[in-house]
């Protein structure tokens, strides 16, 4: 068995062999820390099938292949496809799809994998420039119960933030409405080649059972409206969102929310009350 991919010397060797330079435009930073990839895979509930976004040269994919029955990995960069065929040749449970994850039919793929392998999870070191759109596709278009991702530390803090903290915003409400969000551990810049200027964190989203059956896109839109200008009161933001003063006051009264409060003081449940009053 060859050396692990996620060690500095092997990664360097692979990058040199294929003349690869990490592409900033694709958010490429390759993990070179075997402990981190192992821990991420172990904690991701990937026993059945696991979907990875952006396998890069295969550092995390390798650990996922060892821990799960099947890995489906979407890679946007065509130049990495032959590299992955080489680095992951020992693993016959890995399917690499050369595609932009944001364009992929993930609902059908999830269904297919669930039928075949019993369960589907997500585990990825996400490209930073598309972290939020990727996560929201998975949140809204699949019912995947466990999503474990490495993201920039600041972004991870926003996902996991509690009300009345500077990081708390629409992103926190939207993710915590659907998931229990847990920061697992920090990953320093030196764990990557090339090292990014910022630290990262691994965040795990566990889908909540029994989420009220509402139009989540409409709810999220209203939440974004309530947070639009953070310094304004919820009344002022809602008034602009609805383009109607009276309606905004009535909705807040019906929801039992004091109009002078600001969105960052409101819990997810309180924002849901506003949405329900609106409907
Ligand atoms: N998983 C590898 C690792 O941990 O070493 C690479 C992670 S790197 C931060 C992000 C990876 O996502 C790169 O391989 C990049 O080419 C790929 N990527 C970027 N945008 C993508 C997209 N829209 N769809 C699929 N892959 C994408």
What are these regions (language model features)?
Residues 207, 225-279:
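C-terminal lobe and adjacent flexible extensions of AdoMet/dcAdoMet transferase-like proteins
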Residues 1-225, 253, 264, 273:
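Catalytic cores of RNA-modifying enzymes
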